[in-house]
């Protein structure tokens, strides 16, 4: 029995509707992904600083003991920011007796990898670091965007490592940044990224151009890096090199790393990047010998939700001793913040909060009063 023309027309229209809906869903999904990444990219607390993860081969008592020590050392480096902290005598003793700091541990199967995962008492470790006059790096840390171009050593073609690529290095970057307690996002690799920056653009390492075309991600820092074979005039031989820059739009750091493998170079870079951030944002005991008080006037705080968000940020800072609401006049909330670092150091830390913006003008009494505007809901 042959179907009627009317039925076929209706079926055709339904099929077209499904195609339209599917296309709309795809667009919405990409938009949502971009929005989610942009929102996530702003400075936020790193919640896993007291957790360590170590890949193991079995679940024996010997392996658990060895992995527990390594996980503890991983957490120590996360909370301090500098691997050399492990050379401290008391830290070495604590690592040997890591069970005193252990809260819980478990084995997790992740694909073909068996992982020992441990949680430690963060406050006890922070107390250990401070007792030894070692730096402490708080939970609120800068976000970064990582543009990485890799050159094929055979055909010399350049390719970008993005979230949408099938690069073998994505998992390595994720694990390396976890190990150091930092956030380093990879570009989505969508149409907008493709129109803004190509692999050759990143390969050139033009920092100002790459930074300006990365605004959509809203990160505190933008990193550009390239990996490829270069000729070393001194040794008259070829070597594998990673060159990079780190910028926040105002300052820039550059360096070159030589290694045997791309994976090894990426791991070295992540360690250097984490060390750089720690040198800027971790707090030394010598800075915390005095108590400082400053008044913060924050405008556009006109709802209870905004007030709570501001208060959460201020109280979560490692340097904060006490926060009090001093006054509320129209949409301006005035807080008195007592901290253990000078005002200029506090301002450096607060620059990570993209919802808090300083006005262009500067107060004469900026040593005791700071003005901010709340941006966001």
Language model features with spans:
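Signal peptide-directed extracytoplasmic domains
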Residues: 88-149, 162-164, 168
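Bacterial N-terminal signal peptides
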Residues: 26-36
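N-terminal segment of the mature soluble domain
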Residues: 68-90, 146-204, 310-335, 340, ...
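A short, hydrophobic beta-strand-centered structural micro-motif
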Residues: 99-108, 186-188, 201-234, 350-366
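Bacterial N-terminal signal peptides that target proteins for export
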Residues: 4-28
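Amphipathic beta-strand/beta-sheet edge segments enriched in Tyr/Trp
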Residues: 47-53, 57, 214-267, 368-376
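Short, surface-exposed ligand-recognition loops at beta-strand->loop->(often short) alpha-helix junctions
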Residues: 297-306, 339-340
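Short, well-ordered alpha-helical segments
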Residues: 51-94, 209, 261-272, 276, ...
């Amino acid at each position: 029995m042959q179907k009627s023309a009317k039925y076929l027309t209706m079926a055709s229209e339904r099929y077209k509707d499904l195609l339209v809906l599917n296309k709309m869903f795809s667009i919405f999904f990409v938009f949502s992904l971009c929005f989610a990444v942009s929102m996530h990219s702003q400075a936020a607390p790193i919640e896993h600083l007291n957790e360590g993860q170590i890949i193991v081969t079995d679940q024996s008592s010997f392996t658990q003991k060895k992995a527990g020590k390594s996980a503890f050392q991983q957490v120590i480096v996360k909370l301090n920011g500098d691997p050399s902290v492990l050379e401290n005598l008391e830290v070495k003793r604590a690592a040997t007796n890591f069970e005193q700091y252990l809260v819980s541990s478990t084995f997790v199967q992740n694909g073909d990898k068996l992982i020992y995962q441990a949680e430690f008492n963060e406050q006890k470790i922070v107390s250990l670091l401070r007792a030894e006059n070692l730096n402490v790096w708080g939970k609120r840390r800068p976000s970064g965007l990582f543009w990485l171009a890799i050159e094929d050593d055979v055909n010399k073609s350049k390719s970008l490592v993005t979230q949408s690529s099938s690069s073998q290095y994505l998992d390595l970057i994720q694990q390396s940044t976890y190990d150091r307690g930092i956030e380093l996002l990879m570009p989505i690799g969508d149409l907008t990224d493709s129109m803004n920056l190509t692999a050759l653009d990143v390969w050139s390492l033009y920092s100002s151009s790459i930074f300006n075309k990365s605004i959509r991600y809203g990160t505190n820092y933008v990193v550009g890096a390239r990996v490829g074979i270069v000729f070393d005039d001194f040794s008259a031989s070829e070597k594998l090199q990673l060159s990079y820059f780190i910028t926040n739009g105002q300052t820039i750091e550059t360096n070159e790393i030589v290694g045997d493998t791309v994976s090894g170079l990426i791991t070295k870079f992540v360690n250097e990047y984490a060390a750089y951030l720690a040198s800027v944002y971790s707090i030394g005991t010598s800075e915390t010998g005095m108590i400082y008080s400053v008044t913060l006037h924050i405008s556009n705080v006109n709802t209870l939700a905004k007030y709570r968000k501001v208060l959460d940020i201020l109280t979560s800072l490692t340097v904060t001793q006490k926060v009090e609401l001093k006054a509320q006049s129209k949409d301006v909330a005035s807080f008195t913040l007592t901290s253990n670092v000078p005002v200029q150091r506090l301002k450096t830390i607060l620059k990570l909060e993209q919802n808090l913006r300083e006005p262009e003008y500067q107060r004469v009494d900026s040593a005791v009063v700071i003005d901010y505007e709340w941006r966001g809901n």
